[in-house]
């Protein structure tokens, strides 16, 4: 596999942006064990590749364990990820848990299965992290995913809420990180093509695609074509919030304002807006308890081993 200078610039950009996100949000610290969730899509392949490259030259020591969850979907090519992960030399685990049957049992035919499937998958990931002693869980969401989620919540949920680059799980046991938070989907797709990753289709479950997310994505791409850099600016706004110029009384004490107490941006009082010259670019439920870990596959020095583990 030969690469051009354009590829090396792309690779450098992705590594630089990922390293910056890790530093800005304190995603990975010395001594961490990071469970890298692998779906078989372009995002997770890119995330693992970049994290492995950064690990080699990082000033801190941290451990990577790649994980794939085989949800027993019909037609899932279960050999693809183990073969790829073995070729990289990374420590990995393959977890089999039949979430597919539970989803099919619970969700009526024709209805979207994504919500329940996601919840069950999340439960298995958390339990796997605990089993392996991983304190960080890395997901492959990128900048475009974060912006897309921001508009989904605003349009359909009435909230200014996106995907945080870093958050604690509800029980406080793990930290979830999104190392690709500064990376564009366009760059990730180009990198995945150049690296010839063995991509696994994402439609094996037969569930209807999230039409709302698709529409928002199409809207954003149309904006980007008309005004290149717009997605960068939207993402930049998520990192440059001014509570006093919104309308959330929980974020800013509007009732306590009085003359002579605070300076304000007077232009905004009269509806004026200041624009930048250039776009800103930033380098456990009962169902869960039914799941059983059928297999842990990890590559030892000679051959893979199989362990039995159950969820209590």
UniProtKB/Swiss-Prot annotation:
GO terms for cellular component: cytoplasm. Pfam families: ATP_bind_3. It is an enzyme of class 2 (transferase). [4Fe-4S] cluster binds at residues 114, 117, 205. The keyword RNA-binding applies. The keyword Lipoprotein does not apply. Pathway: tRNA modification. Its EC number is 2.8.1.-. Disulfide bonds: none annotated. It is found in: Cytoplasm. InterPro entries: Rossmann-like_a/b/a_fold (IPR014729), TilS/TtcA_N (IPR011063), tRNA_Cyd_32_2_STrfase (IPR012089). Binds 1 [4Fe-4S] cluster per subunit. The cluster is chelated by three Cys residues, the fourth Fe has a free coordination site that may bind a sulfur atom transferred from the persulfide of IscS. One of its GO terms (molecular function) is 4 iron, 4 sulfur cluster binding. Its cofactor is Mg(2+); [4Fe-4S] cluster. GO terms for biological process: tRNA thio-modification. A motif (PP-loop motif) lies at residues 39-44. It catalyses: cytidine(32) in tRNA + S-sulfanyl-L-cysteinyl-[cysteine desulfurase] + AH2 + ATP = 2-thiocytidine(32) in tRNA + L-cysteinyl-[cysteine desulfurase] + A + AMP + diphosphate + H(+). Homodimer. NCBIfam families: PRK10696.1. This is tRNA-cytidine(32) 2-sulfurtransferase. It comes from Cupriavidus pinatubonensis (strain JMP 134 / LMG 1197). The gene is ttcA.
